[in-house]
């Protein structure tokens, strides 16, 4: 059973990535509270815009890019090969996103409902959507990311299947469109139009179709049959196999 679950090494890496990402979620929640109070309130749908003395847009975009770099860096350290690193990134991103709202809600008293609208991201345009939408994506990322990291730890790296990758890209594109469609329409009006934007309807049918494709790609990759053994994979899986009490490195 321990081998199937990935052993202590696998769960140690999963826990380490999750704790790091959860701590980042708290830091993100605290930083966003400060920024939104500077701009007139924590609820982006009802706040009255107040322009601070210094423009913070460039700093905020840079902070978001730095956050992605931090998540990617810890994923590169946690994984040994493509499966572990990709899995660690999914786990870190999903945990960060979920814990951000788990910390933000009690600290700020908002959102009051999973259907409240929020500004989700700013790169390349503002992403708008109900809080529930990114939470669903984050949950799928956590489950599939942890599964990939555990599989790598036990030396059972799944085969990379390009049809699943294409399905995931298509699903991600559909979800991204639902988030930025309103901002893309308003972009012609410049920064003032983007600041004044308050979406009123979310394209749930398109989002759910994209989410189904994205989740299927995530989970399909995490559960795919193991790739044929290679010398590189043997080196990556050697620590997990050597730790097995029966020493049966080649018995499956």
Regions found by a protein language model. Name each.
Residues 34-40, 102-121, 184-195:
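Interfacial helix-loop-helix junctions of multi-pass membrane proteins
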Residues 9-21, 79-95, 156-167:
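Interfacial segments of alpha-helical transmembrane regions
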Residues 98-157:
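Membrane-proximal helix-loop-helix units in multi-pass membrane proteins
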Residues 50-73, 122-144, 201-209:
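Membrane-interface loop-to-helix entry segments
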Residues 2-6, 74-82, 143-154, 219-226:
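Structural signal for the C-terminal ends of transmembrane alpha-helices
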Residues 87, 94, 138-140, 145, ...:
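Small-residue hotspots
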């Amino acid at each position: 059973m321990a081998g199937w679950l990935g052993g202590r090494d696998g769960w140690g890496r999963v826990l380490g990535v999750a704790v790091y990402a959860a701590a980042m979620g708290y830091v993100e929640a605290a930083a966003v509270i400060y920024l939104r109070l500077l701009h007139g309130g924590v609820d982006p749908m009802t706040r009255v815009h107040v322009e601070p003395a210094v423009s913070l847009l460039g700093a905020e975009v840079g902070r978001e890019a730095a956050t992605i770099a931090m998540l990617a860096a810890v994923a590169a350290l946690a994984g040994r090969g493509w499966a572990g690193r990709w899995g660690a990134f999914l786990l870190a991103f999903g945990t960060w996103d979920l814990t951000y709202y788990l910390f933000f809600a009690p600290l700020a008293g908002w959102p009051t409902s999973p259907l409240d609208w929020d500004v989700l991201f700013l790169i390349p345009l503002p992403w708008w959507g109900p809080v529930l939408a990114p939470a669903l994506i984050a949950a799928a990322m956590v489950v599939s990311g942890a599964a990939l990291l555990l599989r790598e730890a036990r030396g059972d790296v799944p085969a990379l299947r390009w049809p699943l990758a294409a399905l995931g890209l298509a699903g991600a594109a559909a979800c991204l469109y639902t988030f930025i469609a309103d901002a893309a329409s308003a972009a012609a009006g410049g920064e003032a139009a983007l600041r004044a934007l308050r979406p009123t309807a979310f394209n749930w049918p398109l989002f759910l179709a994209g989410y189904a494709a994205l989740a299927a790609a995530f989970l399909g990759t995490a559960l795919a049959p193991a790739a044929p053994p290679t010398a590189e994979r043997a080196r990556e899986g050697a620590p997990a196999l050597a730790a097995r009490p029966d020493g049966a490195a080649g018995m499956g």
